[in-house]
């Protein structure tokens, strides 16, 4: 997967750029990232319970962290 997608997702989430996050959700080839973004945006727009929104946000951020760690390790393995 493209490391830039995870970087963009983190940036758009931090800056509350939901339109750009939605575009990234459609364009990324990482199905799990797309699904996490979808769940977060749905909770952001429709959920009344803040705890659910917070859970979806943390789920998205944990996945981004996990995926970037794996991507970084793959890049190091290619260089050695």
From Swiss-Prot:
- Pfam families linked to this entry: YhdB
- Top-rank lineage group of the source organism: Bacteria
What InterPro entries would the database entry show?
Answer: YhdB-like (IPR025431)
User: What protein is this chain from?
Assistant: Uncharacterized protein YhdB
Q: Which gene encodes it?
A: yhdB
């Amino acid at each position: 997967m493209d490391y830039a997608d995870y970087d963009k997702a983190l940036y758009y989430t931090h800056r509350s750029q939901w339109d750009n996050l939605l575009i990234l959700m459609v364009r990324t080839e990482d199905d799990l990232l797309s699904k996490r973004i979808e769940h977060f945006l749905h909770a952001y727009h429709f959920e009344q319970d803040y705890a659910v929104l917070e859970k979806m946000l943390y789920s998205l951020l944990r996945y981004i962290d996990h995926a970037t760690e794996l991507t970084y390790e793959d890049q190091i393995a290619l260089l050695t």
